[in-house]
């Protein structure tokens, strides 16, 4: 309430610190001006406030992913020096949303967005179970009758794995590399695609949003999505969610379902594109369109 009365960012940051330290609650809630996704300039955040009940039973599989994260993170296709020195294992729960006051209800949330808190104190992940159910129903657009049957039967279970990897290991991994006081890049990084050494990094005082400007949030969503699609195919990950790692058809179906849902999101995202200004009004949909 003090934050709403004064507008103090530090007060809101303190509330987020208390929130991430509240591990394993029965009731979850959070509010504030959190995301900047619908501002083309990525500056003005919009309000969201929600209250939900934690589904303890369904949360177990997400906690397994958290517990195994230190074994999964090294499987990502980039140098280990680009990862945090220590992964701050977050709370990861499945929620049944009671009320969500905002423009739309997402499938998963990874907050707070304050980089200093995320890097040094941690964050929380939540999967919105009843939001995912409605998403599965709407996923039938742009599909044939046969495809609709596959999507209807498999979207909740398959997309759950993608969202889990997207939130925990997409948004939750990696760090910004800053040039040292001696003017050198602190590690000899090699581009995993080209094999060439990196010659640039962040300068002191720079950050992600400032460096990439209007594309920063969409770029971040692309990063998280590609992590999700890559990781969900790994035995070390999908078996945690009950998939049979030896069943090639099941794993191919999961990847197909997840990619098809992404294509759908990219097509629907055109609703958020302003032809007059050549700008997108939502970061997730722009990222999905680029991916598509």
Regions found by a protein language model. Name each.
Residues 156-169:
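Short alpha-helix carrying the canonical HExxH Zn2+-binding catalytic motif
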Residues 1-159:
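Contiguous, non-catalytic segments that form substrate-binding/exosite surfaces or channel walls
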Residues 105, 114, 133, 168-170, ...:
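Short, glycine-/Ser/Thr-/acidic-enriched flexible segments
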Residues 171-183, 234-242:
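Secondary-structure transition/capping motifs at alpha-helix termini
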Residues 51, 141-158, 181, 204-217, ...:
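Glycine- and acidic
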Residues 208-211, 215-222, 226-292:
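Long, well-structured alpha-helical subdomains associated
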């Amino acid at each position: 309430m003090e934050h709403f009365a004064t507008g103090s960012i530090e007060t809101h940051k303190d509330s987020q610190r208390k929130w991430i330290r509240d591990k394993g609650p029965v009731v979850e809630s959070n509010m504030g001006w959190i995301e900047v996704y619908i501002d083309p300039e990525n500056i003005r955040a919009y309000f969201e406030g929600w209250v939900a009940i934690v589904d303890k039973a369904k949360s177990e599989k997400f906690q397994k992913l958290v517990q195994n994260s230190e074994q999964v993170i090294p499987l990502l296709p980039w140098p280990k020096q680009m990862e945090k020195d220590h992964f701050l294992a977050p709370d990861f729960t499945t929620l049944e949303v009671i009320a969500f006051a905002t423009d739309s209800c997402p499938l998963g949330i990874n907050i707070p967005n304050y980089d200093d808190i995320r890097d040094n104190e941690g964050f929380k992940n939540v999967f919105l179970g009843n939001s995912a159910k409605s998403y599965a129903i709407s996923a039938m657009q742009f599909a044939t009758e046969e495809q609709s049957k596959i999507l209807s039967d498999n979207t909740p279970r398959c997309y759950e794995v993608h969202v889990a990897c997207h939130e925990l290991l997409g948004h939750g991994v990696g760090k910004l590399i800053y040039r040292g006081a001696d003017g050198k890049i602190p590690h000899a990084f090699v581009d995993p695609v080209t094999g060439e050494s990196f010659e640039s990094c962040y300068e002191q005082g720079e950050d992600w949003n400032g460096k990439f400007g209007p594309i920063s949030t969409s770029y971040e969503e692309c990063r998280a999505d590609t992590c999700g699609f890559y990781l969900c195919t790994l035995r070390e990950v999908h078996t945690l969610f009950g998939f049979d790692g030896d069943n090639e058809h099941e794993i191919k179906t999961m990847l197909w379902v997840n990619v098809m849902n992404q294509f759908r999101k990219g097509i629907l995202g055109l609703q958020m594109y302003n032809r007059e200004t050549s700008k997108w009004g939502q970061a997730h949909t722009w990222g999905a369109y680029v991916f598509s």
